[in-house]
Amino acid sequence: MLLNKITFFERFEHDILSGAKTITLRDEAESHVITGQILPVSTFETDRWFCDIQIIDVTPVKLTELTEMHAKQENMTLPQLRDVIAEIYPGLEQLFMIRFRILLQ
């Protein structure tokens, strides 16, 4: 079943709105989106809408395959990215990279 919205922690809102964050790494349950799909984006904490995004593509990626390029697209260093993934998805190896672009209002 396709996602009909996506949430991000509030701490990522500025990076998304500024265009600094252009991907998100998710588990399998949150990977059900398709190229071209438009999703409303809300904060995880309060479900407050702050923008819409369009999905560019979805690619499986293992935690061990993450590179500095992934980290740059997340607007983090690689160690920061690995720490965030470990915090959100402890013990998970298989991730899905969702590349997106923000839709201007």
UniProtKB/Swiss-Prot annotation:
Belongs to the N(4)-acetylcytidine amidohydrolase family. Gene3D superfamilies: Hypothetical protein. Pfam families: ASCH. This is N(4)-acetylcytidine amidohydrolase. One of its GO terms (cellular component) is cytosol. One of its GO terms (molecular function) is hydrolase activity, acting on carbon-nitrogen (but not peptide) bonds, in linear amidines. Keywords: Hydrolase. The keyword Hydrolase applies. Catalyzes the hydrolysis of N(4)-acetylcytidine (ac4C). Its EC number is 3.5.1.135. HAMAP family: ac4C_amidohydr (MF_00684). Residues 7-93 form the ASCH domain. NCBIfam families: PRK04980.1 (NF003443). The active site is at residues 21, 24, 74.
